[in-house]
Amino acid sequence: MIGKEVTVQDFVLKLSEIQPEVLPVDLLCEEELPNEQETEEELDIERTVFKIVAPCGCSCCQVKLRLFVNATDSGIRTFQELLFRDLQLLCPECRGNCKHGGS
């Protein structure tokens, strides 16, 4: 550095000395883009409309909730498992009695 002010020309970076594991990356690697036909096949996933009737998750409420979803077969099975195990739907009235965030 010459002078009292630092300029960009005063900095010389030698990454190989600082971080020897840093190697240049070939951005033109051997990747291939999918064909248009493969892309169209992925978009043609068959979905079906399902009507779900489930009781309110609150123990004191007898309301039946109706929910309509558009899902794949595997998606609706996953949702069904959640409803049977970890997830409970609430009606608007019971939701108003609960605090958000699990409190």
UniProtKB/Swiss-Prot annotation:
<dbReference type="Pfam" id="PF00527">
    <property type="entry name" value="E7"/>
</dbReference>
<feature type="region of interest" description="E7 terminal domain">
    <location>
        <begin position="1"/>
        <end position="45"/>
    </location>
</feature>
<keyword id="KW-0862">Zinc</keyword>
<dbReference type="GO" id="GO:0003677">
    <property type="term" value="F:DNA binding"/>
</dbReference>
<dbReference type="GO" id="GO:0042025">
    <property type="term" value="C:host cell nucleus"/>
</dbReference>
<keyword id="KW-0899">Viral immunoevasion</keyword>
<keyword id="KW-1048">Host nucleus</keyword>
<keyword id="KW-0553">Oncogene</keyword>
<dbReference type="GO" id="GO:0008270">
    <property type="term" value="F:zinc ion binding"/>
</dbReference>
<keyword id="KW-0804">Transcription</keyword>
<comment type="subunit">
    <text>Homodimer. Homooligomer. Interacts with host RB1; this interaction induces dissociation of RB1-E2F1 complex thereby disrupting RB1 activity. Interacts with host EP300; this interaction represses EP300 transcriptional activity. Interacts with protein E2; this interaction inhibits E7 oncogenic activity. Interacts with host TMEM173/STING; this interaction impairs the ability of TMEM173/STING to sense cytosolic DNA and promote the production of type I interferon (IFN-alpha and IFN-beta).</text>
</comment>
<dbReference type="GO" id="GO:0006351">
    <property type="term" value="P:DNA-templated transcription"/>
</dbReference>
<keyword id="KW-1121">Modulation of host cell cycle by virus</keyword>
<keyword id="KW-1114">Inhibition of host interferon signaling pathway by virus</keyword>
<keyword id="KW-0805">Transcription regulation</keyword>
<dbReference type="GO" id="GO:0019904">
    <property type="term" value="F:protein domain specific binding"/>
</dbReference>
<dbReference type="GO" id="GO:0003700">
    <property type="term" value="F:DNA-binding transcription factor activity"/>
</dbReference>
<keyword id="KW-1078">G1/S host cell cycle checkpoint dysregulation by virus</keyword>
<keyword id="KW-1035">Host cytoplasm</keyword>
<keyword id="KW-0238">DNA-binding</keyword>
<comment type="function">
    <text>Plays a role in viral genome replication by driving entry of quiescent cells into the cell cycle. Stimulation of progression from G1 to S phase allows the virus to efficiently use the cellular DNA replicating machinery to achieve viral genome replication. E7 protein has both transforming and trans-activating activities. Induces the disassembly of the E2F1 transcription factor from RB1, with subsequent transcriptional activation of E2F1-regulated S-phase genes. Interferes with host histone deacetylation mediated by HDAC1 and HDAC2, leading to transcription activation.</text>
</comment>
<dbReference type="GO" id="GO:0039645">
    <property type="term" value="P:symbiont-mediated perturbation of host cell cycle G1/S transition checkpoint"/>
</dbReference>
<feature type="short sequence motif" description="Nuclear export signal">
    <location>
        <begin position="76"/>
        <end position="84"/>
    </location>
</feature>
<dbReference type="GO" id="GO:0030430">
    <property type="term" value="C:host cell cytoplasm"/>
</dbReference>
<keyword id="KW-0945">Host-virus interaction</keyword>
<feature type="short sequence motif" description="LXCXE motif; interaction with host RB1 and TMEM173/STING">
    <location>
        <begin position="27"/>
        <end position="31"/>
    </location>
</feature>
<feature type="zinc finger region">
    <location>
        <begin position="56"/>
        <end position="94"/>
    </location>
</feature>
<comment type="similarity">
    <text>Belongs to the papillomaviridae E7 protein family.</text>
</comment>
<dbReference type="InterPro" id="IPR000148">
    <property type="entry name" value="Papilloma_E7"/>
</dbReference>
<dbReference type="GO" id="GO:0039502">
    <property type="term" value="P:symbiont-mediated suppression of host type I interferon-mediated signaling pathway"/>
</dbReference>
<keyword id="KW-0244">Early protein</keyword>
<dbReference type="GO" id="GO:0052170">
    <property type="term" value="P:symbiont-mediated suppression of host innate immune response"/>
</dbReference>
<protein>
    <recommendedName>
        <fullName>Protein E7</fullName>
    </recommendedName>
</protein>
<keyword id="KW-1090">Inhibition of host innate immune response by virus</keyword>
<keyword id="KW-0479">Metal-binding</keyword>
<keyword id="KW-0863">Zinc-finger</keyword>
<keyword id="KW-0922">Interferon antiviral system evasion</keyword>
<keyword id="KW-0010">Activator</keyword>
